[in-house]
């Protein structure tokens, strides 16, 4: 049964027996054992796959797909880099075989191999772009650090110049000597910081009561002054000052009256 399939495939694909299987080991010791690929793969894989490239000489549809997929697999296999220890010397006289794929790329179907080849190329391109991005980022970081160092240099120079310059001394307060102080300030400090007492505004009732008391007695005793101060809600000092002012006014009035009377008496003298 196996010889039937082998003979049929050998007739259809004349360059099939020249292709060899990837061998993982010392190729010098094992190459003779797997020389004939048709006899090796006929019993293991059946008629579906026998280690040869099914895309060679196939015009129409095959067992595993169309010719375009086979061509893409052949192109991906030739584009993929091959490691030297997995390569085998080709003995075909018709056309050179494609470079064998690494272990991760070997699969039973050509579609899977083309997919892996696309993934490898994408991985290489993404790795290159990542390396370019990292170099770009590192260059930008280098520029940023350089600019930061340039900015720090003027700041440090400004700080050094500020430290070297003497800071302005606070304005000194004027010195006050004892003879400049005000000594004759009232103990009540009613008039404020100047020491001038505000003028007392007496009510009409207080003025009337003080006028009555002055009419009866122009000089008050201490006892009577205390009584009037409690009655009018005033201090003793206010009562004393009011009586002093009232006496001065009374004396002035009396002096003017006496002078007028004297002048009038001399004028009428015969």
Swiss-Prot record:
Claim: Flavoprotein is one of the keywords in the record: no
CDD domains xrefs: homeodomain
UniProt short sequence motif Antp-type hexapeptide, positions renumbered to this chain: 176-181
Protein keywords: Developmental protein, DNA-binding, Homeobox, Nucleus, Transcription, Transcription regulation
SMART domains, per the entry: HOX
Transmembrane segments: none
Primary location: nucleus
Cell location: Nucleus
InterPro entries reported for this sequence: Antp_homeobox, HD, HD_metazoa, Homeobox_antennapedia, Homeobox_Antennapedia_CS, Homeobox_CS, Homeodomain-like_sf
Swiss-Prot/TrEMBL GO biological process terms: anterior/posterior pattern specification
Region: Disordered, residue numbers: 75-175
GO CC list: nucleus
Low complexity composition-biased segments: 75-86, 119-134, 154-166
DNA-binding region range list: 195-254
PANTHER family the UniProt entry points to: HOMEOBOX PROTEIN HOX, HOMEOBOX PROTEIN HOX-A5
Known role: Sequence-specific transcription factor which is part of a developmental regulatory system that provides cells with specific positional identities on the anterior-posterior axis. Also binds to its own promoter. Binds specifically to the motif 5'-CYYNATTA[TG]Y-3'.
Record family assignment: Belongs to the Antp homeobox family.
Quaternary structure note: Forms a DNA-binding heterodimer with transcription factor PBX1.
Protein name according to UniProt: Homeobox protein Hox-A5
Protein encoded by which gene: HOXA5
């Amino acid at each position: 049964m196996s010889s039937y399939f082998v003979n049929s495939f050998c007739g259809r694909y004349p360059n099939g027996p020249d292709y060899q299987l990837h061998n993982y080991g010392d190729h010098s010791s094992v190459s003779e054992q797997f020389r004939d690929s048709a006899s090796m793969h006929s019993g293991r894989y059946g008629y579906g796959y026998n280690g040869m490239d099914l895309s060679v000489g196939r015009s129409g549809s095959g067992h595993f797909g169309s010719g375009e997929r086979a061509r893409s697999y052949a192109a991906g296999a030739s584009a993929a880099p091959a490691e030297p220890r997995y390569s085998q010397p080709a003995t075909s006289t018709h056309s050179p075989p494609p470079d064998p794929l690494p272990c991760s790329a070997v699969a039973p179907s050509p579609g899977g191999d083309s997919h892996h080849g696309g993934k490898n190329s994408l991985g290489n391109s993404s790795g290159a772009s990542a390396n370019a991005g990292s170099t770009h980022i590192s260059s930008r970081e280098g520029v940023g650090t350089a600019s930061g160092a340039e900015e720090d240099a003027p700041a440090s120079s400004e700080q050094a110049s500020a430290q070297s310059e003497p800071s302005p001394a606070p304005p000194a307060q004027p010195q006050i000597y004892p003879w400049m102080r005000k000594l004759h300030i009232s103990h009540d400090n009613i008039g404020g910081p100047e020491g001038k007492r505000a003028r007392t505004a007496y009510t009409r009732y207080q003025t009337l009561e003080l006028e009555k008391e002055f009419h009866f007695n122009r000089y008050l005793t201490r006892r009577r002054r205390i009584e009037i101060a409690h009655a009018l809600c005033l201090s003793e000092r206010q009562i004393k000052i009011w009586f002093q002012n009232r006496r001065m006014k009374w004396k002035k009035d009396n002096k003017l009256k006496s002078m007028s009377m004297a002048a009038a008496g001399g004028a009428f003298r015969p």
